[in-house]
Amino acid sequence: MNYNKKTVRDIGVAGKKVLLRCDFNVPMAKDGSGIITDDKRIRAALPTIQYLLDHNAAVIACSHMGKPNPTFEAYVKKQTEKGKDPATLTEEKWKKSLAELSLKPVAARLSELLGREVIMAADVVGPDAQAKAAALQPGQILLLENTRFEKGETKNDPALAKAMASLAEVYVSDAFGAVHRAHASTAGVADYLPAVSGFLIQKELEIIGGALANPKRPLVAILG
């Protein structure tokens, strides 16, 4: 199997808007404080982000976090399955559950790590994301809201994938922990944009390729 895939170095990004799929599914404090308890996944995305910014791209980052219920009906169904009384389930509680999975804390931490502003969109492909993506300039970075807030994300809905792709000119896949999922933001968008991998995926593929082609011995293979 060929593990040499095209990366961001193989495509021109200067002056272009780049949709970057990251894996910002980071653990949060369980007290609802919005504190990130481990930021290594954010740090893992920095080399690709910094490369794009240094090469004058306008970066539109996106990621999922957790397993939110994108509609109130889905929320009620899920909570009912857990044994909750439907009469106690309100839209206010549903919206609170969404707020707890917002990427706003990620934007704040990413801003600290980059030493520059990270613009936060209030939605994924809605009016706010569209307006901010359209206004984004080279050297700036925009973070879309949790992709799983869109009900079409986990279904790889072509309409959602096309809407996300319309925000940019190039797609960079760098969410190694999520690339096995055929979702709109990980698979579908690649049908509408030139697509390459980021440095995190490149690194992981090199490790996998080396382990298969020339493994260090003795070795133990664990399959699950």
Where are these regions (language model features)?
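Active-site loop-to-helix "anion-binding N-cap" substructures in soluble metabolic enzymes
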Residues: 1-224
